[in-house]
């Protein structure tokens, strides 16, 4: 059973990497499909949620991008980069107060991490 879980995680990461390869080539729609497939395989694969949020934002699908970025923050609440990503997407959508809140959380986490 554990081996199957490890295989799924590996497949999800491989699928994410394929999606990222397409993203950097400008094949955004195709990358979104692969990010979504990676998430179907492993819903806790944070990097896939990050990639999905960025790709959706690039397409102007801001509501979906925000939802994906919020899921990333839910999965990695102590990671400043998760909050920074959410802040950037909120800013792109004109949600300035919300973006500033997310940025402040990111900065607070960065300061906390630098103290340890």
What is each residue range found by the language model?
Residues 1-12, 88-116:
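Terminal, low-structured helical/coil segments at or just beyond the last alpha-helical repeat
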Residues 8-41:
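Alpha-helical segment of the N-proximal tetratricopeptide repeat
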Residues 25-34, 59-71, 93-105:
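Structural signature of tandem alpha-helical TPR/SEL1-like repeats
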Residues 37-58:
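Short, charge-rich amphipathic alpha-helical segments embedded
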